[in-house]
Amino acid sequence: MPRIKRGNVAVKRRKKILKRAKGFRGTHSKLFRVANQQVMKALRYAYVGRKRKKREFRSLWITRINAAARLNGTKYSSVIHSLKESKIAINRKMLAQMAVADPDSFVKVLSSAKAS
C-alpha cells in the first residue's frame, strides 16, 4: 500500500494563514503557529467589530439628530415620536444626513411631522 503524501495540502494551508497574517508585527507574521493564533484572534476582532460598527453609527446618527432638533427647539425623543405619529417613514441615517447636509429640509420634515 503506497504512503499518502499530503505535503502540498499542508503547505497550502500554512501559506494561506501566513498570507492572512501579512502586516502583523514580528513573528506574528513569520512563524506559522504564532501567526495562526493571531489570525484567529484577528478574525474574532473583525467579527465583533462588524457588530460594534452598527451600534456606533446608530448612536452617532441619534446624536446628530438630537443636536439638530435642539437647534430647532425640540428634543430627539419628541422628533421620533412625532415622526411615528404622522407615519413619516424615514430612518435615522437619512435624518442625520439631512440634519448635517441640508438643515432646511430637516426643518421642513420636523414641521410636517408636528403638523400631522
UniProtKB/Swiss-Prot annotation:
Coiled-coil annotated spans: none
Entry's Gene Ontology BP terms: ribosomal large subunit assembly; translation
Keyword Lipid metabolism tagged: no
SUPFAM superfamilies attached to this UniProt entry: Ribosomal protein L20
Keyword field contains Protein transport: no
Subcellular location: Plastid, Chloroplast
A GO MF term: structural constituent of ribosome
Assigned keywords, A-Z: Chloroplast, Plastid, Ribonucleoprotein, Ribosomal protein, RNA-binding, rRNA-binding
Gene Ontology CC annotations of this record: chloroplast; ribonucleoprotein complex; ribosome
One Pfam short name: Ribosomal_L20
InterPro entries for this protein: Ribosomal_bL20, RIBOSOMAL_L20_CS, Ribosomal_protein_bL20_C
Summary of the function given for this chain in its UniProt record: Binds directly to 23S ribosomal RNA and is necessary for the in vitro assembly process of the 50S ribosomal subunit. It is not involved in the protein synthesizing functions of that subunit.
The family this protein is said to belong to: Belongs to the bacterial ribosomal protein bL20 family.
Protein name: Large ribosomal subunit protein bL20c
Species assigned in the record: Rhodomonas salina (Cryptomonas salina)
